[in-house]
Amino acid sequence: TTILLTNQILSNMFKHLNALFIGLALFACTSGAVAQTIKPIETPVPVRPAGQKDVVGLTAPKLDVVRVGFIGLGMRGPGAVERFTHIPGTQIVALCDLIPERVAGAQKILTKASLPEAASYSGSEDAWKKLCERNDIDLVYIATDWKHHAQMAIYAMEHGKHVAIEVPSAMTMDEIWALINTSEKTRKHCMQLENCVYDFFELTTLNMAQQGVFGEVLHTEGAYIHNLEDFWPYYWNNWRMDYNQNHRGDVYATHGMGPACQLLDIHRGDKMNYLVSMDTKAVNGPA
C-alpha cells in the first residue's frame, strides 16, 4: 500500500512539475527575459515498401554452430575475438583488418585458446568484402571506424549474413533506414552491440524492474562518461580523436539512453513522443 501510494503521489507531483516547467519555458520564450532558440528536428518514418515486414520479432533457423567473421581488429575487435573463444557453439572462421599486423595479433588470440587459425584478410580497403562473400560464415561482427559500419553491415546482409555492429551502427538517418530495410528484405538479424545495455549491471537492474522490485518506474536517469586517453593509439588513422575534436556533446547517446529505454519498455508497448537536447557553451571543444 505504501509503495502504491508513493507512486501515486510521485505521479501527480511529476505531472504538476511538468506543467510548471512548460509554463515557465513558454513564459521565458514569449517575455523576452531569456534568449533561446528552439529548433525541432523532424524524423519522419518513410513509407514502408509493400509486403515488407518488420523484424521486431524476427526468428531465424537454429544454428548448431555459429560461424563468425570479424571485421576491424584495432580498438574493439581483439576483445570481441577473445570473448568468442569462450562461447560454446561458435567458430571463428575469418579475421579482417586493413593492417596485417592486427590480423596476426588476433590470430595469436586463437592460438592461445588452442583454436585453429582463421582465414586472414588485410592489406586492402575492400578486403572485408571478400570475407562477407564467403559461404561458410553465418555472422559478421563489425568493429571498424564508425563511418564504415552501415555499408559493411548492408553488404554482409545482402550476402546472406547476420550482422552485429559496434556502437553506433549508423551515422545518418538514411543509413539507419537502409539498415532497417536491408534487414527486413533479407530477413537477417541486424544487431547493434550496445554493451551498456547488455552488461551485467544493466541487465540485473532491468530484471529487478521487470520483477516489480521498484514498483512502477516513473523516472529514469542515464549518463556515460569515458576517458579514452589510454586508448588513442589503437584507433586506426586517429579517426576517433578526429571525431571528438570536430564534434561536441554525447556522440553515442545510446550508452546512457538505452538502459533507461529498456526500463520504460520503449518500443515494446510504449514510445518516445519527443526528445529534448540541451547544449552548453563550448569551452575547449569545437564551437
Model-predicted regions and their roles:
Residues L5-F21:
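Bacterial N-terminal signal peptides that target proteins for export
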Residues A19-C29:
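Bacterial N-terminal signal peptides
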Residues A118-I142:
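A structured beta-alpha segment of the ubiquitous adenosine-cofactor-binding alpha/beta core
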Residues G72, T186-M191, C196-A287:
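Predominantly a Rossmann-like dinucleotide-binding segment in NAD(P)-dependent oxidoreductases
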Residues L139, D145-W146, A150-Y198, G212:
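Beta-strand-loop-alpha-helix segment that lines the small-molecule cofactor/substrate pocket
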Residues I38-A113, A260:
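N-terminal Rossmann-like dinucleotide-binding module
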Residues A94, L139, H219:
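Short, Asp-centered acidic motifs that coordinate Mg2+ and/or phosphate
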Residues A33-A35:
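Boundary at the C-terminal end of the N-terminal hydrophobic targeting segment
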